[in-house]
UniProtKB/Swiss-Prot annotation:
Highest taxon of the lineage: Eukaryota
Species of origin: Tremella brasiliensis (Jelly fungus)
Bilayer topology term: Lipid-anchor
Keyword Membrane: yes
Alphabetic keyword roster: Cell membrane, Lipoprotein, Membrane, Methylation, Pheromone, Prenylation
GO terms for cellular component: plasma membrane
The protein's name: Tremerogen A-I
Coiled-coil positions: none
């Protein structure tokens, strides 16, 4: 998780 601290899905590679 390095993308969004708010949205773990986005950091994980989720849409």
């Amino acid at each position: 998780d390095s993308g969004s601290s708010r949205d773990p899905g986005a950091s994980s590679g989720g849409c």
